Amino acid sequence: SAIVSAGSGTYYFSKLISQKYNKKSIALMLPKSYKYSNFYYIIAQEHDHPILLDNLLAIPLNLSYPSPKGYIKKIEDKKSLAVIIGGDNGIFTMPYHVIKEKLDEIFKKYPDYLKYVTTSRRTSSKIEALINEYNFNYKIIYSKEPNINPIGDFIAICDKFFITIDSTSMLSEVRANSDAKINIIELESKKENTKYHKLASIINDMDEKLDFVKILKRIKI
């Protein structure tokens, strides 16, 4: 058996517990502030550029297993799409006109699709106000409803996704668990060739969900 940890806040306790009870310690994602040799196995994302080690497996996308919460239901004979909006960060700036042009394009190009949208804690009030101008069939504005996460429902029913490039976890989660077409919304970038761009490139080269079972068979515990 093993102790599995995911995220910077868990690695120390995983190491402590595994040593105390003589268990194998497995880290999901790259534990950058720790000695990699402290872990029996590390499962890291390729866009983090992990070094080659015997105890490290680099995978294209994050391990994830979303489940629908029932916020929306599949309507038979109706196609649907989801728009997932992030916001400014240290690399990207989200211009108002970029999102407006993309939303205009979506509503013009897909008039018969059901349209869903969700924002994030980084989405500006200006972008939230813009989203409110459109007639989405289902809408979650993070600043108003921070405790609702509809991503599992979107993954279960949507035929297309439009996701801003800054939203790496959402890009990874959707591609890992859905065969739907993913359209990445480009933003103004302060730097090039970052891990965000690397992940976007990986996703653009994939047209179906990831077979985690096949990949993880390489790990022997």
Can you name each region flagged by the protein language model?
Residues S1-L57:
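Active-site and donor-binding regions of nucleotide-sugar-utilizing enzymes
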Residues Y138-P146:
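Active-site donor-binding acidic/aromatic loop of nucleotide-activated sugar
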Residues I42-Q45, L114-R121, N183-E186:
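Short internal beta-strands
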Residues Y21-K24, F39, D112-Y113, S178-K181:
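A short helix->loop->beta-strand "cap" motif at the edges of active sites that frequently abuts
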Residues Y34-K35, P50-L52, I91-T93, R122-A129, ...:
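Short, charged/polar "capping" segments at the starts of alpha-helices
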Residues I151-N193:
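A donor-sugar binding/catalytic signature common to diverse glycosyltransferases
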Residues S64-S125, S143-K144:
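Active-site donor-nucleotide binding/catalytic segment of nucleotide-sugar enzymes
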Residues R175-R218:
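Nucleotide-sugar donor-binding patch of glycosyltransferase catalytic domains
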